[in-house]
């Protein structure tokens, strides 16, 4: 299982999202100082009712908590878009 697949599986289990996309952007950062550690760069868009009533920082903290130690060991950078289903529907196309 790739890191991106593991991230997707972990987030699906933790948040039961209506929409989830995980992009591995590690290749875009080849030669970057942080890439030397082997940690990957990922972009995640996740839509879940679990984010209702939470501010942006709390949503991000919930995702970090779900990913646990991987945030320190295997993930160097993580760009997040965390939305509720209502926010997702109101989002411009």
Model-predicted regions and their roles:
Residues 1, 48, 74:
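N-terminal/domain-start segments enriched in small and hydrophobic, helix-friendly residues
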Residues 1-35:
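N-terminal first-folded block
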Residues 16-18, 38-42, 74-78:
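A generic structural signal for short beta-strands and their flanking turns/coil linkers
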Residues 23, 45-47, 81-83:
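Solvent-exposed beta-strand sheet faces enriched in polar/charged residues
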Residues 31-48:
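A short, structured beta-strand/loop element
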Residues 54-55:
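Beta-rich strand-turn-strand
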Residues 61-93:
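C-terminal structural segments of small proteins and small subunits
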């Amino acid at each position: 299982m790739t890191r991106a697949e593991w991230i997707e599986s972990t987030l699906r289990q933790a948040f039961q999202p209506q929409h989830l996309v995980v992009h591995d952007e590690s290749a875009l950062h080849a030669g970057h100082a942080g890439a030397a550690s082997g940690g990957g760069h990922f972009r995640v868009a996740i839509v879940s009712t679990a984010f209702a009533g939470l501010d942006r920082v709390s949503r991000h903290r919930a995702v970090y908590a779900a990913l646990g130690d991987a945030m320190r060991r295997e993930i160097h950078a993580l760009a997040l878009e965390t939305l509720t289903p209502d926010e997702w529907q109101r989002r411009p196309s």
